[in-house]
Amino acid sequence: MAKLTKRMRTIREKVDATKQYDINEAVVLLKELATAKFVESVDVAVNLGIDARKSDQNVRGATVLPHGTGRSVRVAVFTQGANAEAAKAAGAELVGMEDLAELVKKGEMDFDVVIASPDAMRVVGQLGQILGPRGLMPNPKVGTVTPNVAEAVQNAKAGQVRYRNDKNGIIHTTIGKVDFDADKLKENLEALLVALKKGKPSSAKGIYIKKVSLSTTMGAGVAIDQSGLNASA
């Protein structure tokens, strides 16, 4: 058997894998276990009661967290004309059409989010093999293909998270940093759960939000007691 690292031994000693923790208790625990030399993110895994093999039960969307994610986000926007000026005014770092596409083709992708107006998709569509595998391809389902690019830029800058379930029906995303106080992390988590509930597939039966776990970038998962959350859709 592989020898446990000191970090893993500490986690095993402090985290009860059979327990669901109150959100405030969980945050205290996460802070104790966050010993990396950088400010770790707080990530969430939400197990959904869906059959991920069925396309009509897949969950995908986006929501703006009330307290953001703690990350600074660089935004690229494919658009032109008045929309280009609006995107720049909203804070987009890169705005263009064919010129921006050429940068992407060269591998110059110093951005975290890509937004496009509908008329720009003829250009963006040619970049699918580059942007797609990186999770950067604009999509109307998450609000990144939109005629209102300025609003989309503002949302991205304000701490919007995009999510989609994996093949096991689990949503993975970030709800902040470990140096956020417990109330901010709680409210961000509640906002995410409300958005997930609003997007519940009509064909999904039984318990929808089956399990919620929080972890830091380098830490173990801590199961959350949902009864202490205000997440009514």
From Swiss-Prot:
Pfam families in UniProt: Ribosomal_L1
Function field: Binds directly to 23S rRNA. The L1 stalk is quite mobile in the ribosome, and is involved in E site tRNA release.
Gene Ontology cellular component terms for the protein in this record: cytosolic large ribosomal subunit
Family according to the record: Belongs to the universal ribosomal protein uL1 family.
Name of the gene encoding the protein in the UniProt record: rplA
Keyword RNA-binding listed: yes
Organism phylogeny: Bacteria, Pseudomonadati, Pseudomonadota, Gammaproteobacteria, Enterobacterales
GO molecular function, a single term: structural constituent of ribosome
Name of protein: Large ribosomal subunit protein uL1
PANTHER family referenced in this protein's UniProt entry, alphabetically: 54S RIBOSOMAL PROTEIN L1, MITOCHONDRIAL (PTHR36427), LARGE RIBOSOMAL SUBUNIT PROTEIN UL1M (PTHR36427:SF3)
Top-level lineage group: Bacteria
Subunit structure: Part of the 50S ribosomal subunit.
InterPro entries, alphabetized: Ribosom_uL1_bac-type, Ribosomal_uL1, Ribosomal_uL1-like, Ribosomal_uL1/biogenesis, Ribosomal_uL1_3-a/b-sand, Ribosomal_uL1_CS
Entry keywords, A to Z: Repressor, Ribonucleoprotein, Ribosomal protein, RNA-binding, rRNA-binding, Translation regulation, tRNA-binding
Single GO BP term: regulation of translation
NCBIfam families, per database record: rplA_bact (TIGR01169)
